Amino acid sequence: MPGKLLWGDIMELEAPLEESESQRKERQKSDRRKSRHHSESEERTETRENGVTDDLDAPKPKKAKMREKLNGDTKEGLRFSDEFSPSHKSRRKDLPNGDVDEYEKRSKRVSSSENSHKSSDKAEETLTREQKEGAFSNFSISEETIKLLKGRGVTYLFPIQVKTFGPVYEGKDLIAQARTGTGKTFSFAIPLIERLQRNQETIKKSRSPKVLVLAPTRELANQVAKDFKDITRKLSVACFYGGTSYQSQINQIRNGIDILVGTPGRIKDHLQSGRLDLSKLRHVVLDEVDQMLDLGFAEQVEDIIHESYKTDSEDNPQTLLFSATCPQWVYKVAKKYMKSRYEQVDLVGKMTQKAATTVEHLAIQCHWSQRPAVIGDVLQVYSGSEGRAIIFCETKKNVTEMAMNPHIKQNAQCLHGDIAQSQREITLKGFREGSFKVLVATNVAARGLDIPEVDLVIQSSPPQDVESYIHRSGRTGRAGRTGICVCFYQPRERGQLRYVEQKAGITFKRVGVPSTMDLVKSKSMDAIRSLASVSYAAVDFFRPSAQRLIEEKGAVDALAAALAHISGASSFEPRSLITSDKGFVTMTLESPEEIQDVSCAWKELNRKLSSNAVSHVTRMCLLKGNMGVCFDVPTSESERLQAEWHDSDWILSVPAKLPEIEEYYDGNTSSNPRQRSGWSGGRSGRSGRSGGRSGGRSGRQSRQGSRSGSRQDGRRRSGNRNRSRSGGHKRNFD
């Protein structure tokens, strides 16, 4: 006999069942109680939701009531859903045709409904504060735009977008600064599109642009235009820059433009020819404003927009300035374009670190002659054969030479100003799609390239200004991902490195070149992954040969040799972990107690080793904490030193990675072990400060050279400081 709770519901589904008079009366009482309970429950629910009970509302259909009861959180609904347990379903098997299926369907609906409520509650609990603040429902964003944003993978607004949406949407002037990779383009694109679509007028042919976005590079202009196009289907977006056809741009002007993005040079050309009318501008955006208002672009920007601005007029276009780096001079120069009352959003502010917080900054000391080979090793260890990397060089010639570097095993392509625009676009498209893994570029790729999959950025030398370093390193670690930036330097460039640390608020981790073990591990992983692409049919052809190899060499040795050959690592040439020079091995000598300087280590070496062995020791420097030293010896001498070393409290070893050291400076940058710096001492092995004549002379020369370099560097810095900043000069290193 079914339970009483189900009786009233199954009456419509079942054939009439025989029942006694007492059972019939009991059933009628139960139905009346249930009906009264349901009506009271619905009244309470309506009162809670609406504040008052509306007696004029039409009664809800029975199916709707049932759905509300099943999906609600009332005890009645929960009890009802409990009735559809597996045991109850098994008891209904004898019902007429269709009844079991109907109950099972209801059971599944109830279960899935409860599960969806639980999962939504759980999802709401796991939302971060950033996601809650950036929820689309908090902003005036249309459903159409939200759909397009989700198509781009954007599910909520990032902090810079949250902070700037209101001021931009309300038409206020704004200066905004945020770190690279935090979504600055959408910060102005989303509210501007919503504002234009809200006030959209009748679409006319040949209409003048209402929004002008100026960017310093073609690549950035292209990226910004794409971001606009991705989130609007109603507005016309055009992108003008050099190296492309004038005629196609003229056709776009004739058809009408709502949002114009471009570089100053090409837009100025269209203005001077009279083809482009900017008299109807309502919004002006300068992206990467620190570069747009610098001497290289400031005059062109002024020529383009000056007619749209009148002194102290509230009718001037809304002005929006965005960048990751905003020196103080930017604010001073920008005031002539801003209304007297403007908003300022700064997500960097007085924080020490100006660069992206998702990037790890490494520095490798390396002579320029060794750099191409070491860069190949760095790519292998930190990026692998599948990762994507960007290498920045200072000149176009360096870019071409680096891309042809035989030590770079991955396919690499060039990007610089002398390459035709059509080829530049093909190159960038291929890099985005992963057709090749390494992009070698000048500063044209430092700003605006938004490719989250970039794992590694390599700067072949410290850049000429801090802003360039920040923007270059910001090509990785984007959209919440982490990345690595490796900066190569020579001893004479230590001052530039320290200046970048100070101004960017970062600390470089000094590391050595990738060790042999690092390379073996990385290459073996790539080789193992490559085996997965071999088909079983191909494997069958090689089974006899494999069997012979196993019999001759053994399974492990045979496979190890095969992996070494596949990875191209059949031999390794040791390098100094200190200077990256070939043919040297770095060794550490750890002291049982703290030492004052390297002279203590020299004394211990002279006491335990032959003079011939000691004469090969070079580039000695203190370990962090003064608990020992590290130094280089020729590869041929490393085993002899270890064999001679015994009966000492000091521990001599060969490290796999460069330990933390006090900064090393090789005064003459020579790799000859007999030419010592001031720290390394003379041939007798004593300290250069107090040692033999040769060591002392070399030490004095080293220190004098250092002081001379400091004086020259000081004069250069003084010259830079005396330079006028009114035009937006950046801190340069000559």
From Swiss-Prot:
Residues 679-698 have a biased composition (Gly residues). Residues 717-734 have a biased composition (Basic residues). Residues 165-344 form the Helicase ATP-binding domain. InterPro entries: DEAD/DEAH_box_helicase_dom, DEAD_box_RNA_helicase, GUCT, Helicase_ATP-bd, Helicase_C-like, P-loop_NTPase, RBD_domain_sf. Residues 38-51, 67-86, 115-131 have a biased composition (Basic and acidic residues). There is a cross-link at residue 122 (Glycyl lysine isopeptide (Lys-Gly) (interchain with G-Cter in SUMO2)). Signal peptide: none annotated. Residues 377-521 form the Helicase C-terminal domain. The modification Phosphothreonine is found at residue 244. It is found in: Nucleus, Nucleolus; Cytoplasm. Residues 11-20 have a biased composition (Acidic residues). Keywords: ATP-binding, Cytoplasm, Helicase, Hydrolase, Isopeptide bond, Nucleotide-binding, Nucleus, Phosphoprotein, RNA-binding, Ubl conjugation. It comes from the Eukaryota. This is ATP-dependent RNA helicase DDX50. The gene is Ddx50.
